[in-house]
Regions:
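Conserved acetyl-CoA pyrophosphate-binding loop and the N-cap/start of the following alpha-helix
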Residues: 83, 87-95
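Conserved GNAT acetyl-CoA-binding A-motif
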Residues: 93, 100-114
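Conserved acetyl-CoA binding element of GNAT-fold acetyltransferases
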Residues: 70-81, 137
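Conserved beta-hairpin
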Residues: 47-62
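Conserved catalytic-core motifs of GNAT/GCN5-like acyltransferases
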Residues: 107, 111-113, 123, 128-146
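A short helix-loop-beta-strand connector motif used in the catalytic cores of GNAT acetyltransferases and
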Residues: 41-51, 106-108
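Short amphipathic alpha-helix that is part of the acyltransferase structural core
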Residues: 2-37
Length: 147
């Protein structure tokens, strides 16, 4: 398959995915699953989102969340396994970087959490580890009990 940058098969659209698409992409791309309720609430707070479509199907996505002034966080960078390795993650990040360049004030703090080797992709867009000056931390709520 040709590189996604040169392929007319892939279209990049600036749009927030619907709840079903969002949950499917997260689960199928290996990100932690989210409930529909969590997705509905979270997607409403999106500052910027991009989707990659192929043949009418959304095969990749990325979002920016935050307060729109001081803090921006890059989240949900996901590409379905069958479409990985084609430069789609790079296209998603290029669109997100363009948004941040246009919209974020110079004093804004832009962050993300890099899973595994994704750190190499993010480094191409200027992201650097914050350690040892700072260290990312998280609080995990227990997943809702399934019936």
């Amino acid at each position: 398959m040709p590189a996604a940058e040169a392929s007319p098969l892939y279209q990049l659209i600036e749009a927030v995915p619907d709840v079903e698409t969002y949950c499917r992409l997260r689960a199928e791309s290996g990100l932690s699953p989210k409930t529909e309720e969590a997705a509905r609430r979270g997607l409403a707070g999106t500052l910027f989102a991009v989707q990659v479509c192929c043949g009418g199907e959304t095969v990749g996505m990325g979002r920016v969340i935050g307060d729109g002034g001081c803090f921006y966080q890059v989240v949900d960078i996901a590409v379905l396994p069958a479409h990985q390795g084609l430069g789609l993650g790079k296209r998603i990040m290029a669109a997100i970087s363009g948004y941040i360049e246009r919209e974020a004030p110079t004093s804004a703090y832009i962050s993300l959490i890099a899973d595994g080797d994704a750190k190499h992709l993010y480094a191409q867009f200027g992201f650097k580890p914050t350690a040892p000056r700072s260290e990312g931390m998280a609080l995990f709520k227990r997943a809702a009990q399934q019936p």
